[in-house]
Protein backbone atom coordinates (compact mmCIF):
# COMPACT_ATOMS: atom_id res chain seq x y z
CA UNK A 1 0.00 0.00 0.00
CA UNK A 2 2.87 2.38 0.81
CA UNK A 3 4.37 1.82 -2.62
CA UNK A 4 1.01 2.55 -4.23
CA UNK A 5 0.68 5.82 -2.28
CA UNK A 6 4.24 6.93 -3.12
CA UNK A 7 3.67 6.14 -6.80
CA UNK A 8 0.53 8.26 -6.93
CA UNK A 9 2.05 11.12 -4.94
CA UNK A 10 5.17 11.17 -7.15
CA UNK A 11 2.99 12.08 -10.11
CA UNK A 12 2.14 15.40 -8.49
CA UNK A 13 5.40 17.09 -9.57
CA UNK A 14 5.12 16.50 -13.35
CA UNK A 15 1.39 17.19 -13.20
CA UNK A 16 1.99 20.47 -11.39
CA UNK A 17 4.63 21.52 -13.93
CA UNK A 18 2.21 20.66 -16.72
CA UNK A 19 -0.46 22.84 -15.12
CA UNK A 20 1.95 25.78 -14.86
CA UNK A 21 2.93 25.35 -18.52
CA UNK A 22 -0.69 25.34 -19.64
CA UNK A 23 -1.65 28.24 -17.39
CA UNK A 24 1.24 30.34 -18.66
CA UNK A 25 1.57 29.60 -22.38
CA UNK A 26 -2.07 29.13 -23.36
CA UNK A 27 -3.05 32.42 -21.75
CA UNK A 28 -0.27 34.14 -23.71
CA UNK A 29 -2.17 33.22 -26.88
CA UNK A 30 -5.02 35.55 -25.92
CA UNK A 31 -5.04 38.42 -28.46
CA UNK A 32 -4.43 41.98 -27.41
CA UNK A 33 -1.86 43.94 -25.46
CA UNK A 34 -2.48 43.75 -21.69
CA UNK A 35 -0.73 47.07 -21.16
CA UNK A 36 -3.22 48.79 -23.45
CA UNK A 37 -5.98 47.16 -21.45
CA UNK A 38 -4.51 48.71 -18.32
CA UNK A 39 -4.46 52.11 -19.96
CA UNK A 40 -8.13 52.00 -20.93
CA UNK A 41 -9.64 54.33 -23.48
CA UNK A 42 -7.45 57.29 -22.50
CA UNK A 43 -4.22 55.54 -23.45
CA UNK A 44 -0.74 56.26 -22.13
CA UNK A 45 2.41 57.77 -23.55
CA UNK A 46 5.07 55.43 -25.02
CA UNK A 47 7.49 55.94 -22.11
CA UNK A 48 4.90 54.88 -19.54
CA UNK A 49 3.90 51.99 -21.78
CA UNK A 50 7.48 50.71 -21.87
CA UNK A 51 7.83 51.18 -18.11
CA UNK A 52 4.75 49.04 -17.48
CA UNK A 53 6.02 46.36 -19.86
CA UNK A 54 9.24 46.13 -17.86
CA UNK A 55 7.37 46.19 -14.56
CA UNK A 56 5.20 43.22 -15.56
CA UNK A 57 8.03 41.43 -17.39
CA UNK A 58 6.46 41.57 -20.85
CA UNK A 59 9.73 42.87 -22.35
CA UNK A 60 11.51 39.58 -21.60
CA UNK A 61 11.62 36.50 -23.90
CA UNK A 62 8.74 34.12 -23.35
CA UNK A 63 10.88 31.42 -21.72
CA UNK A 64 12.40 33.95 -19.34
CA UNK A 65 8.91 35.12 -18.45
CA UNK A 66 7.93 31.53 -17.67
CA UNK A 67 11.02 31.02 -15.52
CA UNK A 68 10.22 34.16 -13.53
CA UNK A 69 6.60 33.08 -13.23
CA UNK A 70 7.49 29.57 -12.02
CA UNK A 71 9.97 30.84 -9.43
CA UNK A 72 7.35 33.23 -8.03
CA UNK A 73 4.72 30.50 -7.96
CA UNK A 74 7.02 28.23 -5.96
CA UNK A 75 7.41 31.08 -3.46
CA UNK A 76 3.63 31.45 -3.18
CA UNK A 77 3.56 34.69 -5.17
CA UNK A 78 0.94 34.52 -7.92
CA UNK A 79 1.21 38.20 -8.71
CA UNK A 80 -1.27 41.04 -8.47
CA UNK A 81 -4.32 41.79 -10.54
CA UNK A 82 -3.54 44.33 -13.24
CA UNK A 83 -6.94 45.92 -12.66
CA UNK A 84 -7.49 45.94 -8.89
CA UNK A 85 -3.82 45.69 -7.80
CA UNK A 86 -4.91 43.09 -5.23
CA UNK A 87 -2.93 39.89 -4.73
CA UNK A 88 -4.30 37.09 -6.91
CA UNK A 89 -4.10 34.60 -4.05
CA UNK A 90 -6.10 36.92 -1.78
CA UNK A 91 -8.83 37.41 -4.37
CA UNK A 92 -8.97 33.67 -5.03
CA UNK A 93 -9.18 32.89 -1.31
CA UNK A 94 -12.05 35.33 -0.88
CA UNK A 95 -14.07 33.91 -3.79
CA UNK A 96 -13.22 30.21 -3.58
CA UNK A 97 -15.64 29.40 -0.70
CA UNK A 98 -18.57 30.50 -2.88
CA UNK A 99 -17.48 28.10 -5.62
CA UNK A 100 -16.87 25.28 -3.15
CA UNK A 101 -20.31 25.82 -1.61
CA UNK A 102 -21.99 25.66 -5.01
CA UNK A 103 -19.94 22.65 -6.14
CA UNK A 104 -20.63 20.77 -2.90
CA UNK A 105 -24.37 21.31 -3.19
CA UNK A 106 -24.24 20.24 -6.85
CA UNK A 107 -22.38 16.98 -6.17
CA UNK A 108 -24.70 16.18 -3.23
CA UNK A 109 -27.68 16.83 -5.50
CA UNK A 110 -26.16 14.49 -8.11
CA UNK A 111 -25.41 11.75 -5.57
CA UNK A 112 -28.77 11.89 -3.78
CA UNK A 113 -30.64 11.47 -7.07
CA UNK A 114 -28.14 9.65 -9.27
CA UNK A 115 -27.25 6.74 -6.98
CA UNK A 116 -30.84 5.65 -6.16
CA UNK A 117 -31.92 6.17 -9.77
CA UNK A 118 -29.09 4.02 -11.10
CA UNK A 119 -29.65 1.27 -8.53
CA UNK A 120 -33.40 1.06 -9.12
CA UNK A 121 -32.92 1.19 -12.90
CA UNK A 122 -30.54 -1.78 -12.70
CA UNK A 123 -32.88 -3.78 -10.46
CA UNK A 124 -35.84 -3.03 -12.77
CA UNK A 125 -33.93 -3.52 -16.00
CA UNK A 126 -35.89 -2.86 -19.23
CA UNK A 127 -38.79 -1.40 -17.26
CA UNK A 128 -40.39 1.97 -17.91
CA UNK A 129 -38.40 3.41 -15.01
CA UNK A 130 -35.15 2.07 -16.47
CA UNK A 131 -35.85 3.55 -19.90
CA UNK A 132 -36.88 6.82 -18.28
CA UNK A 133 -33.64 7.06 -16.27
CA UNK A 134 -31.54 6.29 -19.35
CA UNK A 135 -33.41 8.82 -21.47
CA UNK A 136 -33.30 11.60 -18.89
CA UNK A 137 -29.63 10.99 -18.11
CA UNK A 138 -28.77 11.12 -21.82
CA UNK A 139 -30.66 14.40 -22.15
CA UNK A 140 -28.98 15.81 -19.04
CA UNK A 141 -25.53 14.86 -20.27
CA UNK A 142 -26.13 16.37 -23.72
CA UNK A 143 -27.82 19.58 -22.61
CA UNK A 144 -25.70 22.77 -22.83
CA UNK A 145 -25.30 24.36 -19.41
CA UNK A 146 -26.02 27.90 -20.58
CA UNK A 147 -29.24 26.82 -22.33
CA UNK A 148 -30.40 24.77 -19.34
CA UNK A 149 -29.68 27.65 -16.97
CA UNK A 150 -31.61 30.16 -19.06
CA UNK A 151 -34.58 27.79 -19.38
CA UNK A 152 -34.76 27.35 -15.60
CA UNK A 153 -34.48 31.12 -15.05
CA UNK A 154 -37.31 31.82 -17.50
CA UNK A 155 -39.48 29.12 -15.96
CA UNK A 156 -38.93 29.38 -12.21
CA UNK A 157 -37.72 32.97 -11.81
CA UNK A 158 -39.52 34.92 -14.52
CA UNK A 159 -42.70 32.90 -15.13
CA UNK A 160 -43.52 31.65 -11.62
CA UNK A 161 -41.32 33.93 -9.48
CA UNK A 162 -40.27 31.04 -7.24
CA UNK A 163 -36.51 31.53 -7.14
CA UNK A 164 -34.13 34.50 -7.41
CA UNK A 165 -32.39 35.20 -10.70
CA UNK A 166 -28.88 35.94 -9.49
CA UNK A 167 -26.54 36.41 -6.55
CA UNK A 168 -26.02 34.45 -3.33
CA UNK A 169 -28.46 36.28 -1.04
CA UNK A 170 -31.01 39.09 -1.08
CA UNK A 171 -29.52 42.57 -0.92
CA UNK A 172 -31.59 43.25 2.21
CA UNK A 173 -29.21 41.12 4.27
CA UNK A 174 -25.63 41.81 5.21
CA UNK A 175 -23.93 38.74 6.59
CA UNK A 176 -20.53 39.14 8.19
CA UNK A 177 -18.20 36.67 6.44
CA UNK A 178 -16.86 34.25 9.04
CA UNK A 179 -16.18 31.05 7.14
CA UNK A 180 -16.88 32.32 3.62
CA UNK A 181 -19.59 29.67 3.24
CA UNK A 182 -22.82 31.63 3.20
CA UNK A 183 -25.05 28.80 4.42
CA UNK A 184 -22.90 28.44 7.53
CA UNK A 185 -22.45 32.19 8.04
CA UNK A 186 -26.20 32.80 7.86
CA UNK A 187 -26.79 30.12 10.50
CA UNK A 188 -24.24 31.84 12.72
CA UNK A 189 -25.85 35.23 12.22
CA UNK A 190 -28.78 36.77 14.06
CA UNK A 191 -31.00 36.68 10.96
CA UNK A 192 -32.51 33.21 10.42
CA UNK A 193 -34.43 34.47 7.38
CA UNK A 194 -31.10 35.05 5.64
CA UNK A 195 -30.43 31.30 5.63
CA UNK A 196 -33.56 30.58 3.64
CA UNK A 197 -32.70 33.41 1.29
CA UNK A 198 -29.31 31.79 0.68
CA UNK A 199 -30.98 28.40 0.12
CA UNK A 200 -33.38 29.88 -2.45
CA UNK A 201 -30.48 31.46 -4.31
CA UNK A 202 -28.69 28.10 -4.38
CA UNK A 203 -31.52 26.05 -5.90
CA UNK A 204 -31.19 26.89 -9.60
CA UNK A 205 -27.37 27.05 -9.77
CA UNK A 206 -27.21 23.71 -7.94
CA UNK A 207 -29.59 22.06 -10.40
CA UNK A 208 -27.78 23.47 -13.43
CA UNK A 209 -24.30 22.56 -12.21
CA UNK A 210 -25.34 19.15 -10.87
CA UNK A 211 -27.22 17.96 -13.96
CA UNK A 212 -24.22 16.54 -15.85
CA UNK A 213 -22.73 14.75 -12.79
CA UNK A 214 -26.21 13.44 -11.99
CA UNK A 215 -26.54 11.94 -15.47
CA UNK A 216 -23.07 10.38 -15.38
CA UNK A 217 -23.46 8.94 -11.88
CA UNK A 218 -26.89 7.48 -12.67
CA UNK A 219 -25.67 5.76 -15.84
CA UNK A 220 -22.46 4.51 -14.22
CA UNK A 221 -24.29 3.21 -11.14
CA UNK A 222 -26.77 1.35 -13.33
CA UNK A 223 -24.00 -0.18 -15.44
CA UNK A 224 -21.93 -1.23 -12.42
CA UNK A 225 -24.95 -2.64 -10.61
CA UNK A 226 -25.99 -4.69 -13.65
CA UNK A 227 -22.50 -6.14 -13.89
CA UNK A 228 -22.44 -7.08 -10.21
CA UNK A 229 -25.95 -8.57 -10.28
CA UNK A 230 -24.73 -10.99 -12.93
CA UNK A 231 -21.90 -12.38 -10.78
CA UNK A 232 -21.90 -15.95 -9.46
CA UNK A 233 -22.03 -14.96 -5.79
CA UNK A 234 -25.22 -12.99 -6.43
CA UNK A 235 -26.82 -16.04 -8.02
CA UNK A 236 -25.66 -18.07 -5.01
CA UNK A 237 -27.31 -15.56 -2.66
CA UNK A 238 -30.53 -15.83 -4.66
CA UNK A 239 -30.36 -19.62 -4.46
CA UNK A 240 -30.08 -19.38 -0.68
CA UNK A 241 -33.41 -17.57 -0.64
CA UNK A 242 -32.17 -14.13 0.42
CA UNK A 243 -34.55 -11.27 -0.28
CA UNK A 244 -33.82 -8.82 -3.08
CA UNK A 245 -33.22 -6.05 -0.55
CA UNK A 246 -30.62 -8.07 1.36
CA UNK A 247 -28.89 -9.13 -1.85
CA UNK A 248 -28.63 -5.55 -3.09
CA UNK A 249 -27.83 -3.91 0.24
CA UNK A 250 -25.40 -6.49 1.65
CA UNK A 251 -23.75 -7.99 -1.42
CA UNK A 252 -24.21 -6.01 -4.62
CA UNK A 253 -24.14 -2.37 -3.59
CA UNK A 254 -20.65 -2.23 -2.07
CA UNK A 255 -18.96 -3.80 -5.08
CA UNK A 256 -21.03 -1.79 -7.53
CA UNK A 257 -20.00 1.49 -5.92
CA UNK A 258 -16.26 0.85 -6.42
CA UNK A 259 -16.13 2.16 -10.03
CA UNK A 260 -18.62 4.89 -9.14
CA UNK A 261 -16.07 6.37 -6.72
CA UNK A 262 -13.70 6.99 -9.63
CA UNK A 263 -16.47 8.59 -11.65
CA UNK A 264 -17.30 10.90 -8.76
CA UNK A 265 -13.66 11.99 -8.62
CA UNK A 266 -13.64 12.73 -12.34
CA UNK A 267 -16.78 14.83 -11.94
CA UNK A 268 -14.90 17.25 -9.69
CA UNK A 269 -13.12 18.64 -12.73
CA UNK A 270 -16.43 18.81 -14.57
CA UNK A 271 -17.93 20.75 -11.66
CA UNK A 272 -15.24 23.42 -11.72
CA UNK A 273 -15.46 23.71 -15.50
CA UNK A 274 -19.23 23.95 -15.36
CA UNK A 275 -19.02 26.43 -12.49
CA UNK A 276 -17.43 28.96 -14.84
CA UNK A 277 -20.58 29.08 -16.99
CA UNK A 278 -23.01 28.56 -14.12
CA UNK A 279 -21.57 31.39 -12.04
CA UNK A 280 -21.66 33.68 -15.06
CA UNK A 281 -25.31 32.87 -15.83
CA UNK A 282 -26.46 33.41 -12.24
CA UNK A 283 -23.98 36.20 -11.35
CA UNK A 284 -22.63 33.93 -8.63
CA UNK A 285 -19.63 35.71 -7.04
CA UNK A 286 -17.20 32.80 -7.25
CA UNK A 287 -13.94 31.87 -8.93
CA UNK A 288 -15.63 30.99 -12.23
CA UNK A 289 -17.17 34.43 -12.73
CA UNK A 290 -13.91 35.99 -11.54
CA UNK A 291 -12.01 34.19 -14.31
CA UNK A 292 -14.57 35.15 -16.96
CA UNK A 293 -14.27 38.80 -15.93
CA UNK A 294 -10.48 38.49 -16.11
CA UNK A 295 -10.72 37.15 -19.67
CA UNK A 296 -12.69 40.18 -20.83
CA UNK A 297 -10.26 42.52 -19.06
CA UNK A 298 -7.17 40.58 -20.25
CA UNK A 299 -5.96 40.43 -16.67
CA UNK A 300 -3.07 38.01 -17.22
CA UNK A 301 -2.00 37.50 -13.58
CA UNK A 302 -5.55 36.63 -12.54
CA UNK A 303 -5.96 34.22 -15.46
CA UNK A 304 -2.64 32.53 -14.76
CA UNK A 305 -3.08 32.36 -11.00
CA UNK A 306 -6.73 31.34 -11.12
CA UNK A 307 -6.17 28.61 -13.71
CA UNK A 308 -3.17 27.33 -11.76
CA UNK A 309 -5.01 27.23 -8.43
CA UNK A 310 -8.05 25.51 -9.91
CA UNK A 311 -5.77 22.98 -11.56
CA UNK A 312 -4.04 22.28 -8.25
CA UNK A 313 -7.41 21.84 -6.51
CA UNK A 314 -8.63 19.37 -9.14
CA UNK A 315 -5.29 17.53 -9.06
CA UNK A 316 -5.43 17.22 -5.27
CA UNK A 317 -9.02 15.96 -5.26
CA UNK A 318 -8.27 13.40 -7.96
CA UNK A 319 -5.25 12.22 -5.97
CA UNK A 320 -7.41 11.70 -2.88
CA UNK A 321 -10.03 9.86 -4.92
CA UNK A 322 -7.33 7.69 -6.49
CA UNK A 323 -5.98 6.80 -3.05
CA UNK A 324 -9.49 6.10 -1.76
CA UNK A 325 -10.11 3.85 -4.76
CA UNK A 326 -6.96 1.92 -3.92
CA UNK A 327 -8.12 1.48 -0.33
CA UNK A 328 -11.53 0.09 -1.20
CA UNK A 329 -10.30 -2.01 -4.13
CA UNK A 330 -7.22 -4.10 -3.18
CA UNK A 331 -6.78 -5.32 -6.77
CA UNK A 332 -5.86 -1.82 -7.90
CA UNK A 333 -3.13 -1.16 -5.35
CA UNK A 334 -1.54 -4.56 -6.02
CA UNK A 335 -1.50 -4.18 -9.81
CA UNK A 336 -0.17 -0.61 -10.09
Go through the PLM ranges and name each one.
Residues 2-4, 96-129, 145, 158, ...:
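Alpha-helical transmembrane segments of integral membrane proteins
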Residues 12, 95, 99, 107, ...:
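Residue-level signal for discrete positions within transmembrane alpha-helices
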Residues 15-67, 156-194:
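Hydrophobic alpha-helical transmembrane segments of membrane transport/permease proteins
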Residues 59-115:
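An internal, D/E-rich "acidic patch" concept
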